[in-house]
């Protein structure tokens, strides 16, 4: 089924041995539009404020009760690799998460992690290499432009709970007197300018 992703922001995130924090944001691949990670605000029980969990460690969200559950203990979460969520996630950081969470994953996603490597071998990596991972929260407020001009403001994402794919953008279109929400397929996105905060569509909205 399809759900508004923003309904989960601020919702409890529960480990197998108790609540660990709340949903801060989600990280998605800006090429496949698939959610890859959940960013959890863990409050004060860890020295760091946020932890990043692969979706492969999560159950389907409980939309009725607005809760996310992980197949991890709080100790496993606390010992996970430290990722600065205010900066783009590097390939090196994702390899560290893959190495740590891989054996803990409750299911396998074809787009998560790296190809299998023989024991003892390391993945070739350049420290500066950055993945195409973006925060859903950081994109809210971006201008959405069609081929025939300005269309609206990005207000959210609609996700398929089975695939974690962001199939639609929730766009507020029109002026303050006649604004309306329009669902725009992500397959219509031509490009995203992170510097200019613009989502460009290759489609007319007239």
Model-derived features: positions:
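Peripheral interaction segments used for macromolecular assembly
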Residues: 1-206
